[in-house]
Amino acid sequence: MRAVSFWLLAFGFWLTSVDVFSQERGGFSLEQKNDTLSVLTLKTDSTCDRWELPYPVYQFCTGDVDGDGSIDAMVGVIKSTRYFKEKGRRLFIFKNYHGLVRPLWMGSKLGGILEDFRFTDGKIQSLERTTDGKYVVAEYRWAHFGMGFERFLLKNVTREEAMKTFNN
């Protein structure tokens, strides 16, 4: 596994430093072409398929999201949606469908205002901001067509408190 650090420029200001990992687990890797274009690649023994992501990327990880035994790719992108016109952090999940990169879920929203996510123990753990400026750490699990809320690990706390739980 190799890491490449870069700064994301979005909305006219620098957001954060991000490490994008070229993970070979499941054959998925992510390459940043420029500030607003990344390419998700799936390499198998017999195929190589690519999916262009014309958005800034803030997170990338892999794991078996839907429990089917194959590795999926989770990509955090910054974009607006049909229902949420303001640009925000979104979660896209891609699967390996016979050696091809195919969308599993391109959700417009989890629960709150998504800041970050990770994949642990078959669940997506999220760091989210609420409309009143508080923070929550929540867990989601695949629920047939999309992510289903499991539980709050922490809620109605400061960002610093939420980060401690999220980073452990």
Describe the predicted segments one by one.
Residues M1-V18:
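Short, basic, low-complexity termini and linkers enriched in Ser/Thr/Gly/Pro
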Residues V18-N168:
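Beta-propeller-forming repeat regions
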